[in-house]
């Protein structure tokens, strides 16, 4: 089994981990429904790029 030859320092470990971060999801305002939604996804009301393509949920 492979084992590191040298101990990884805290600084080296933390420099590597600087790129592990969360990013906020891209959100756009949909003029058709008046809601905010994720880009390139069908809104909760069944609209995509201003066109009705799916039935809305029965919860509305």
UniProtKB/Swiss-Prot annotation:
Residues 7-20 have a biased composition (Basic residues). It comes from the Bacteria. GO terms for biological process: translation. InterPro entries: Ribosomal_bL32, Ribosomal_bL32_bact, Ribosomal_zn-bd. GO terms for cellular component: large ribosomal subunit. The keyword Ribosomal protein applies. Keywords: Ribonucleoprotein, Ribosomal protein. The keyword Ribosomal protein applies. Signal peptide: none annotated. This is Large ribosomal subunit protein bL32. The gene is rpmF.
